[in-house]
Amino acid sequence: MSAQARAKRPWRGVLALDAAIDRRVTQPRKRGITMVIDKGIGPAALADIDAVAAPYIDHWKLAFGTSALMPPQVLADKLAFLRERGVLTYPGGTLLEAAVVQQHCRVFMQRAEELGFTAVEISDGTIDLPRDRRRRIIDCAREAGLVVITEVGKKDPQCQPEAAELAEQALDDLKWGSSFVIVEARESGRGIGIYDKTGELRSSFLEEIANLLGDKIDQLIWEAPQKEQQAALVARFGANVSLGNVAVNEVLALEALRAGLRFETLAAVADREKASGQWDPDMPEPDEGPATRESARQELRHD
């Protein structure tokens, strides 16, 4: 984070807040990705979100088949707006699965590029894809000039693969040219993948995937639509864990959680600081002195 960027923060100079925010890697990010799920907002709403949360948005997924139903000019305007800001855009994987069933994979990739998408999500959450077919679809997307994002896992709660299967598929996808791998959880985050039917994290399942991925773990994007899930993953992997299926209006809330500026993560930070002796609740705040206070006032006057 540059000094110039830090100086523009509303709460600059409050060292604890600066330190909390500085824990995050900055754009363009290769880890600590926030993937937003868009179920159909318009250009005005997109501009509003950009105005308040642009530094915290990395990927933008137009959910399931919504991009096929949107007015063409609206879709074009949204994709152009996001592309100008360096945000990776892709349609939901279900749309590609529908094209694969009709043997239209290559046409789909060409059309995605023409429409202005910069990436594509390749999944088999609904259909079954043989390994070789999946690899060839990845090749097809790359030949079309698209960044490849794959997804592992099934959407049906009754057909959930084991952790080792998910990890093996993720490693194969990365070897075949995928830039990131999303771990399926759907929009509900219940009974799918790393979550049980109540939405709680299946810790042993998660740890098995993490252990098998090893140093590739930063290329996983964990779908985490619920606040409690986001908090649990931040607690496990740190502020720079990659999270997906984040609601459009929850981007800033997630960033506050990452920075330890919400109850769910601040409590852990406070406990850690207290245990290490860095913070003593009984110790009064030191007097900064009039010179320091006057310097702060001068800084505010010259903004």
UniProtKB/Swiss-Prot annotation:
Keywords recorded for this protein, A-Z: Coenzyme M biosynthesis, Lyase, Plasmid
Top-level division of the source organism's lineage: Bacteria
GO annotation terms (biological process): coenzyme M biosynthetic process
InterPro entries in the record: Aldolase_TIM, ComA_synth, ComA_synth_sf
Ranges for region Disordered: 273-303
Reactions listed under catalytic activity: (2R)-O-phospho-3-sulfolactate = phosphoenolpyruvate + sulfite + H(+)
EC supergroup of this enzyme: lyase
Single annotated GO MF: phosphosulfolactate synthase activity
EC number: 4.4.1.19
Residue spans of biased composition, Basic and acidic residues class: 290-303
Family, as annotated: Belongs to the phosphosulfolactate synthase family.
Additional observations: In Xanthobacter strain Py2 coenzyme M plays a role in epoxide carboxylation by serving as the nucleophile for epoxide ring opening and the carrier of the C3 unit that is ultimately carboxylated to acetoacetate.
Function: Catalyzes the addition of sulfite to phosphoenolpyruvate (PEP) to yield (2R)-phospho-3-sulfolactate (PSL).
Protein name per the record: Phosphosulfolactate synthase
Species, as recorded: Xanthobacter autotrophicus (strain ATCC BAA-1158 / Py2)
Lineage, opening ranks: Bacteria, Pseudomonadati, Pseudomonadota, Alphaproteobacteria, Hyphomicrobiales
